[in-house]
């Protein structure tokens, strides 16, 4: 997954899910309709991605399956029931929001630490070793 996708989940997905889970009955009706559409889009998109990852034998297939089985249906359920949604669904949504935040922050940290930066001492060490080998070559001629 890319850094952009992690950042999207941290700064867009988490706040949206937390907002709906926390404010429940104070959320405008159009937000519930949006959750229904979003849930359906998530299910369809992740079914498509799951097929691709299945063919590639990707170890990340589980992410798509979680979205198909858990995230999408939960959003559709809350969206369709709007103000009549039971309390447990909002609590599960809150858990999903914090799980998404935690997982994506963790993955972002892992990916950022894997990025390799060029340090000045690495550049100078390479230059010093290459100039030393050139000097040895010229001295023996």
Walk through the language-model features, giving the residues of each.
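Hydrophobic alpha-helical membrane segments
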Residues: 9, 62-79, 96-99
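Membrane-helix boundary elements
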Residues: 10-33
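Membrane-helix boundary connector in multi-pass membrane proteins
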Residues: 22-26, 57, 75-93
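Loop-to-transmembrane helix junctions at the membrane interface
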Residues: 52-66
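Membrane-water interface at the C-terminal end of transmembrane alpha helices
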Residues: 81, 100-115
């Amino acid at each position: 997954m890319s850094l952009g996708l992690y950042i999207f989940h941290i700064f867009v997905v988490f706040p949206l899910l937390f907002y709906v889970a926390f404010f429940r009955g104070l959320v405008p009706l159009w937000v519930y309709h949006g959750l229904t559409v979003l849930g359906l889009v998530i299910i369809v998109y992740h079914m498509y991605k799951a097929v691709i990852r299945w063919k590639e034998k990707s170890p990340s297939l589980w992410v798509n399956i979680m979205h198909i089985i858990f995230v999408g249906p939960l959003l559709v359920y809350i969206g369709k029931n709007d103000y009549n949604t039971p309390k447990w669904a909002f609590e599960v949504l809150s858990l999903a929001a914090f799980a998404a935040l935690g997982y994506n922050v963790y993955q972002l940290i892992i990916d950022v630490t894997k990025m390799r930066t060029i340090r000045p001492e690495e550049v100078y060490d390479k230059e010093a070793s290459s100039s030393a080998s050139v000097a040895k070559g010229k001295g023996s001629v």
